[in-house]
Amino acid sequence: MTSEIIVQTAEELIELGVTLGSLLRGGETIELIGDIGAGKTTLTKGLARGMGIAEEVQSPTFTLSRVYDAPNRRRLAHYDFYRLNNAGIMQAELAEVVQDARTVTVIEWAAVVGDVLPDDTLRIAIRVQADDTRRLELEAGGKCSKHIVQELMK
């Protein structure tokens, strides 16, 4: 199942993230696809806000990962593998994290760890358009991610 959403501004991208975050209960995996500057971390900032995380989300480009505590014993694990050619130990860590029912896992530049992502991964490709709007293509990999996409499209 693939759906498409157009956002006009960074604020709309954050608001979409807020809505997405409000739908997440833990155990979900989201792969963000897009060029540098497309808005992957911006979307994640909104997602964190929607999960009830007050802490400011920062890009994990140089740290590879950041974890944020959310209400109701949930967590947001945000990964950015842009700088990795080989996942190494991060692949083993990620394999554990995506199995945690309390953790929402968001991964940027996931190609290097793609074989550990669950089948039921929500893939969101963010494409910058000529007029600087963003076209988001949402692909649901399974039942849970399909439900999330259906709720987002309402």
Predicted region positions:
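Conserved lysine of the Walker
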Residues: 40
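Short hydrophobic/aromatic beta-strand immediately N-terminal to the Walker A/P-loop
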Residues: 29-31
